[in-house]
């Protein structure tokens, strides 16, 4: 079993309680990038229920924050998902061997395997230019 242990424990990445806009999937990605790569991603002020309003916050991730789409993921790549939606509405961090770190709505942040559940919602992997 692959075990991910964050480098810094001042802001634990695993076991967080969910809170929209403060402790959610994107804040987990931001904190991972800050702790693991010393890269500070900009915050996004998500509008509540944005994915059902047709807003596409993750669509411009590449141009806005320095990410490029990649085919073969490596540790630290952002993985994006469309979960019961027409726009990408969930993100996580690829760790290793199909294991990713994420924070789903109303759950605690955790590591999970992309298979069999999450792979059907995955849209793409994105790599930061400085990671």
Predicted regions located by residue number:
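Short, flexible active-site loops
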Residues: 8-18
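Active-site nucleophilic cysteine motif
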Residues: 18-37
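Glycine- and charge-enriched low-complexity intrinsically disordered segments
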Residues: 112-131
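...with weaker cross-activation on analogous glycine-rich loops/strands in unrelated enzymes
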Residues: 45-109, 115
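Residue-level marker of positions within ordered structural domains that often coincide
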Residues: 33-34, 97, 130
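Short, structured interface segments
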Residues: 1-9
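Short amphipathic alpha-helical patches
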Residues: 32, 52, 56-60, 124-128
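Glycine-rich phosphate/pyrophosphate-binding loops
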Residues: 37-46
